[in-house]
């Protein structure tokens, strides 16, 4: 059964303007305590009071030992997150990851081996697969896009248009795929968009307002819709 929610309130990881210059995205991953809170929410959403089918069909003392394999070519992202789902829901499970994030895994590659109580592992399986598929899907698509500009000096930048609650895992996966991290939230930089420009009447006035009211070293960017705006 899922572990009880801890009363401990971990400190949430806050964003910083000083992002790493390398493409090591590990700073984007949640702390272990924060990840466990996320897992508890995922399990509560999926399992509810119990995994009714598994508890009916699988004997209480049954054991399971299986490999998690990929069905298509994918860029791995979130392998340790997926493994932690099993470890958290089934503490007695033995979980061994067989591949690292960032690797292009060919169809049929074994990603993880899991052994332990059958009921618990079956209950945890879909949650683990869902988060792994979500993260690998992002990394795989981004890798495809990034490969298109490998021969140029252009950089692929991510956004904050993410599924609520999944931002850091999404941005981590985008970076694994080849993106550069942009703002982690509304708090860590000024980005002037069409609505802001409309209020002030021009980019020049909007930028002047931003410069007047933000600390000197705060990064200010303008999202342009036309070449004329770029020139301004």
PLM regions and their residue ranges:
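Acidic/glycine-rich phosphate/pyrophosphate-binding loops and surrounding catalytic core
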Residues: 2-232
